[in-house]
Amino acid sequence: QIDNGNLGDALYYTKQENSNFGLRLRMLVRTIDELDYIPPMPVSLDLKEVRWEEWKVLFKQIVEDSVYEVILLDIGESVQGLLKMLDLCDRIYMPVLEDDVSQEKLRQYEENLQRLQLERLMEKTYMFIGLQDIENKMRQLVKEEVL
C-alpha cells in the first residue's frame, strides 16, 4: 500500500493555516474492515515529543473539520498529557492481562488516579481481563458508540 503519511503528518497539518485539514486527513486515513485509522509514527520516540497542547488541537480539528464523531485512541503512558487526554474521553477501554505485572500496573493506575483526585477517570474505565476475544469485544463497543 502507498505510504500516504502517518500521525506525525496529521499533527503537522494542524499547525498549517488554511491547510484544509479535513481533506488532508482523508488522504492519511487507511481502513481495516470498517475501521478508519491514521497509521502511527514510524519512530515511537517521536510520539513522546508531542506536547499535550498539540494532541488537544489535533482532536479538536478531527471532530470539527472531518466526518468523524468518535475517536478511538490506542495510547500508552509515554504520551505527554495522558491524564488530560483520558479526561477528554467519554469512555476508557482498558485491556488487562491476568499476569502479576499487568495486575500491578492496574493497581498503580487506580492508586495514581486516587492520589491525583481523578476518580472520575476510573468511573469511565471499562476493563477487559485476559485476551480471549478482545478484538471482537472492542469492535462491538466501537459499533455501539457510533450507533
Show which residues each predicted segment covers:
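Generic detector of short, locally flexible boundary/turn motifs and exposed helical patches
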Residues: I2-N6, L35-P39, K56-Q61, I92-M94
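Cytosolic-facing regulatory segments adjacent to core modules
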Residues: N20-V29, P39-L73
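Conserved catalytic-core segment of NTP-binding enzymes
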Residues: V57-V146
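Phosphate-binding loop that captures ATP/GTP phosphates
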Residues: Q1-Y37
